[in-house]
């Protein structure tokens, strides 16, 4: 192979890797001048069409006379060839360094990938951590406490409802007792009115009795005066009285009878009045005693009801305070449980994000590993191509360049240049593709044959 073919291949390799081409002073004009004067070999496999055209041009014999041999041009060509050779060696050394760095990076990424795969397998295979068990146990205990508090709350609500029913019943009894008390007070007012009426009647009867007694006294006095007058008149006229007594009925007996009748009537009236008054007073006293006893019992019941109402009110207030405290405690516990659950959810979310991040990192490492494998295979292909090119170049450079000048000096005319021998090299390249599907690695392998052409 010619050095121009090697130069075109190295340039294409530098374009593949993104490096800047190395400037060379070996221009096309110098190659043309060299081929025109010395009949240099045709270019390599960089372009088959150009090489064939170059063969056609170089197939015509070029005769160079001894007089026109330009040693300065040969020396310039040798110097340019040495410069190109040194540049190619530097480029090859740089490519080798880059390839070594790529190899190191690929090994490092393979190690990281193996570590990540091991960690993922361990994370998948191992049981849930102790922290999750502790969290679940704590949540179960908190749920049990919440259920107990709910049961206590229901029990307290039932007791509160029972106390409310008892309070309503006691209020109803209180209302009934109040109505009874009002009825008793109304009856007492009526009885007092009856007592007042009876008192007035008694006073009126007493006045009547007094008036009757006064009348009886007056009648007694009148009767005594009449008796005295009669006695005086009788003593003054005894004979006449005796005569009149014989003629008229006995006045004394008549007065005695009248007096006895009046006394009987008065005593009867007094006795009847006293009996009526006593019976009425006894009835009123019994009614007053009954009413006072009922009133006293009503007052006692009312006081007892008041005491029960006060005790029940205090108990209800205490239960209300306890209920409010339990409600506040339950609310605080619910808020605390909500905050803890939110913290657990945040922790779970953070762990899931971390796992997702690790999966993304692993996928990225796998993609980088795949890209590096592709670059490695491309580098292997280009290194093989370089190796073939270098082998052909070294075999071609084995003949010293100064033989060209001696050959030109000895022969009057340059011989025809035979067409270069084309070599075909086939190489089987194994392409291994590693993909990640649903967290699992899928490895696919394909083989591809590549052919490379060269000239010797």
Curated annotation (Swiss-Prot):
The organism named in the record is Xenopus laevis (African clawed frog)
Composition-biased stretches, type Basic and acidic residues, lie in 434-456
Stretches the record annotates as Linker 1: 124-134
Q: What quaternary arrangement does the UniProt entry report?
A: Forms homodimers (in vitro). Homopolymerizes into a filamentous network (in vitro).
Task: Sum up the protein's function in the record's words.
Answer: Class-III neuronal intermediate filament protein. My form an independent structural network without the involvement of other neurofilaments or may cooperate with other neuronal intermediate filament proteins to form a filamentous network.
Please state which protein family the record places this protein in.
Belongs to the intermediate filament family.
* Record PANTHER family: GLIAL FIBRILLARY ACIDIC PROTEIN, PERIPHERIN
Task: Enumerate the Gene Ontology biological process terms.
Answer: intermediate filament organization
Localization per Swiss-Prot or TrEMBL: Cytoplasm, Cytoskeleton; Cell projection, Axon; Perikaryon
Here the segments flagged for biased composition (Low complexity) are 16-55
Region annotated Coil 2, chain positions: 253-395
Chain intervals for the UniProt region annotation (Coil 1A): 91-123
Spell out the residue ranges making up region: Coil 1B. Answer: 135-230
Q: Name one GO molecular function term.
A: structural constituent of cytoskeleton
Q: Where does it primarily localize?
A: cytoplasm
Its cellular-component GO annotations read: axon; cytoplasm; perikaryon; plasma membrane; type III intermediate filament
Entry's SMART domains? Filament
Region annotated Tail, chain positions: 396-456
Write down what this protein is called: Peripherin
- Which residue range or ranges hold the IF rod domain? 88-397
Q: Annotated region Disordered: where?
A: 1-55, 411-456
């Amino acid at each position: 192979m010619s050095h121009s073919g090697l130069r075109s291949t190295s340039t294409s390799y530098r374009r593949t890797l993104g490096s800047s081409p190395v400037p060379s002073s070996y221009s096309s004009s110098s190659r043309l001048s060299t081929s025109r004067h010395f009949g240099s070999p045709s270019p390599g496999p960089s372009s088959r069409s150009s090489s064939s055209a170059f063969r056609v041009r170089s197939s015509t014999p070029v005769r160079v006379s001894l007089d026109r041999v330009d040693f300065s041009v040969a020396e310039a060509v040798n110097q340019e060839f040495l410069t190109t050779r040194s540049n190619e060696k530097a480029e090859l050394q740089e490519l080798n360094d880059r390839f070594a760095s790529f190899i190191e990076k690929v090994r490092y990424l393979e190690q990281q990938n193996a570590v990540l795969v091991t960690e993922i397998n361990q994370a998948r295979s191992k049981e849930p951590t102790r922290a999750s068990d502790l969290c679940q146990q704590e949540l179960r205990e908190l749920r049990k406490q919440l259920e107990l508090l709910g049961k206590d709350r229901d029990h307290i609500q039932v007791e509160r409802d029972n106390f409310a029913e008892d309070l309503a019943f006691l209020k109803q009894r209180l209302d009934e007792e109040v109505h009874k008390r009002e009825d008793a007070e109304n009856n007492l007012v009526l009885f007092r009115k009856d007592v007042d009426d009876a008192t007035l009647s008694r006073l009126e009867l007493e006045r009547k009795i007094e008036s009757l007694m006064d009348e009886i006294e007056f009648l007694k006095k009148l009767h005594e005066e009449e008796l005295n007058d009669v006695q005086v008149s009788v003593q003054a006229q005894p004979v006449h009285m005796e005569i009149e007594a014989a003629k008229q009925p006995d006045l004394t007996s008549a007065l005695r009878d009248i007096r006895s009748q009046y006394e009987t009537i008065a005593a009867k009236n007094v006795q009847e009045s006293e009996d009526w008054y006593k019976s009425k007073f006894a009835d009123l006293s019994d009614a007053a005693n009954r009413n006072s006893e009922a009133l006293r019992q009503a007052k006692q019941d009312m006081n007892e009801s008041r005491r029960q109402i006060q005790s029940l009110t205090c108990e209800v207030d205490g239960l209300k305070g306890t209920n409010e405290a339990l409600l506040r405690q339950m609310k605080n516990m619910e808020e605390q449980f909500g905050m803890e659950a939110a913290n657990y959810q945040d922790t779970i979310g953070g762990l899931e994000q971390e796992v997702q991040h690790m999966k993304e990192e692993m996928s990225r490492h796998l993609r980088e590993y795949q890209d590096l494998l592709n670059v490695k295979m491309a580098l292997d292909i280009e290194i093989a191509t370089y190796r073939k090119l270098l082998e052909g170049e070294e075999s071609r450079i084995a003949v010293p360049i100064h033989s060209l000048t001696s050959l030109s000096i000895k022969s009057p005319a340059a011989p025809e240049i035979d067409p270069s021998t084309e070599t075909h090299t086939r190489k089987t390249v194994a392409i291994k593709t590693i993909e990640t599907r649903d967290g699992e690695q899928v490895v696919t392998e394909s083989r591809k044959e590549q052919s490379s052409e060269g000239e010797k």
